């Protein structure tokens, strides 16, 4: 083996001395020494001929213009002396190499030593996390959270009960501190909803009173263009980990504003698909979104109806704080059906126009529940009752001003591409899913 290595060494030197080969750089290799090593010699984690760096026989040594012939002669002399090199004691050579500890320090496993951290300020806690390798609060945010946080000045909302990101061993469980009353998600005396009838009809039907629908949204960003135009899937959660597909949504590529197509057919998310249920369209700034059903705005037999309007408060000055949103829905009749409102009908006003004119007779106004600032966690928190486990600027709960404890809808992140979405009366699956899609969309001037 030693003879073969020396032959290969000589061949490489001869090959590099030939015309047309790229010569080695004159930069010196100075690897930083690890503080854990007591050996004072500089080490290079190379095996084979590269271990002779720094020796007179370095194959990467700098060659001058008139040194090619000298190198050629040296190569021939080394070939002639190869037999004498075989007499070197192999055990001494192995012992010499092993004493250099030729282990790549960059590939060595890093052991994180956990140490208790005393309560401290955010700045000192940040440096402490860097020393002990603890993930920071921002590590739980995805790229959309960073974009909304840096551009819009919004702050992420943390589920209540999750420990401080600046403390060791933060728990990732929902809080049980608040009582599960009739207004809380999953409260007593409330049944979990199930699909009744056909999917296309069920997703448009308002939820019955006293029934809670627990859903899950999955974001699919795999594929050529799904990094910019992901597909979102809505499933109804059932017992024992089972789930039922309800809706799918994707952002249209060729559109002047954000435009999402929603369909109950996961294989065909297009405007002309049989499963087309409606769409979500935003204004230029991404501050206002309107939800429409599958009707045709040019038709008089089945006109397009307004299902909801989502308005995000602008934040021109960039003040830090949770994102504020207002959701306007059509009012409900005595038999728990939506009031038909169509902005496409020139004879009547749409939901947004009615809200701007303060004509609240046939519309319902919802707001996001204001998160509470927690001094211990140094973040805004909401009690999601265990349904949301990660902080995000997209986490929210919708309530009515007359009953802030009755959560109409809540939405939040549980992993990088998985979100929970729970809704109840008077929302339907289509409305709730569209509201969640508006939260995913990028917002330049929103808080």
Swiss-Prot record:
UniProt keyword terms in alphabetical order: Cell membrane, Cell projection, Cytoplasm, Membrane, Nucleus, Phosphoprotein
Subcellular location: Cytoplasm; Nucleus; Cell projection, Cilium membrane; Cell projection, Rhabdomere
Region (Disordered), start-end ranges: 54-84, 168-191
Gene Ontology CC: one annotated term: ciliary membrane
Gene3D superfamilies in UniProt: Tubby Protein, Chain A (3.20.90.10)
Keyword Cell membrane: yes
Protein's name according to its UniProt entry: Protein king tubby
Biological source species: Drosophila grimshawi
Record gene name: king-tubby
